[in-house]
UniProtKB/Swiss-Prot annotation:
Record protein name field: Maturase K
Gene Ontology biological-process annotations: mRNA processing; RNA splicing; tRNA processing
Family, as annotated: Belongs to the intron maturase 2 family. MatK subfamily.
PANTHER family noted in UniProt: MATURASE K
Species assigned in the record: Cycas taitungensis (Prince sago)
Any GO MF annotation of the entry: RNA binding
Pfam name, any one: MatK_N
Amino acid sequence: MDKFRRNGKEDTFRQRRFLYPLLFQENLYAIAYDHYLSRSSSFESMENSSYNDRFSFLTVKRLISRIRQQNGSIVSFGNYNQNKNKLVGHNRNFYSELVLEGLTVVLEVTFSIQSKHYLEGMNEWNSFRSIHSIFPFMEDKFPHSNFLLDIRIPHSTHPEILVRTFRYWIQDAPSLHSLRSVLHEHRNLILSENLDQLILIASKEKTRLSLSVLWNYYVYECESLLVPLWKRFSYSRSLSYGAFLERTTFYRKIEHIVIFSHKSIKDLKKRIWFLKDPSIHYVKDRERFLIALRGTYLLVKKWRYHLTNFWQCHFHLRSQPYRMSIDELSKNCFSFLGYLFSVQMKTFVVKIKMLDDSFITDPITKEFDPIAPTTLLIGYLAKERFCDISGRPTGRLAWTGLTDDNILHRFDRIWRNILHYYSGSSKKDGLYRMKYILRLPCAKTLACKHKSAIRVVRERFGSELFTKSSPKERELISLSFSKTRSQRERIWHSDILQRNPFVNSWWNKQNLQVETPFDR
């Protein structure tokens, strides 16, 4: 892989236009074959894959040669002469998967080359890989916005739309013909209802890696067209007229600019103030876009109309209205990556002292407030059978066959994962409850194993029961739950590279809700 990347870096122009010869590199299909076997071991036993021993690179090359000879027409991998190619039964899908994997490796190389210049200049790129790295950005930018546009990217796309997307990047016609053939072979996977269903079906078909690459290309195409437009909009800021309202001549000019102007300077000042410095801030998770805007409600509706036309005209997709919602940040909360966020209006007392007098004022500020969703966390623990739906702890009878250290380690690991991920929550009372819910099932499981009472288990193992926590982690817990203001600051970690299992469960639940059309 490093060799192909170096070759592409030396001559990116040639790499983009002549990718087809890479498909004949046996190293690529060796990688694809390893990917296929690794996923086969996860979904089915090796005894069921009797055709693995008959794998042939020459057969794969013949398949690709036939695709090239068809002059771009769609080829079915099962329409070969059985006497010539010996490609029968389940071997058809097997070699189809290998061709798809080979294309995936080639596309991954080109995608990494094209997107590498976006990472140049980031000296601390490792810290930006953390999921928590997005929260400080939201904490800094979102309180200054007043509207939030929540968008679900349309993803039920036609294979030809993906081919057209790749044509902007890859100008090698034979590679595009091969890609078109493979995409039509897996058309049912691409035309799934939602992304989670696509990943589920793709896992069964052992093409999850390949489809994730296609999805990344599709999302990158959306971002490459929308983000520059948002940047130009943010840079073209309106002029603030607040400092010039006392001038009569300037007021007359503004009166002609604003359509619904008022004779009262007070009313006019309020209207002009909302036109000051519009801005757009954007974050993404999977197929979900969050766009925070500062401007009028009419401006937000125009952006929603523009995005609807964008997907309809550029990708020939119809975006349903229920997949785009508009929320006012000061009145509504929103969820993202397992957190519940809201923008709260906070007041604090300031004493201003002048030369001859002093007075007290209470300015109002906006504060970004992340909260751990306690109720949904309890629902997830109930689903995993740590408690019932009301939060009453229950024991894990399936773990009674494990050793005491293994049981303690499992409960302790679950608690530390929850605490680590939700360390940025502004309210720690819900995490206290999570610890209580997990501590009692741990004691009940040990009591059931030793056939004793919970009181005996507590006397033996101590009241804490989570004995695997290191001193550094216990210090972090004490700081997180401290009552002083200086020690209750939110903590965002730079080592969280994967989503919490609860976040994935919550995401699936939200997708089921959002797929039911309703009027926003």
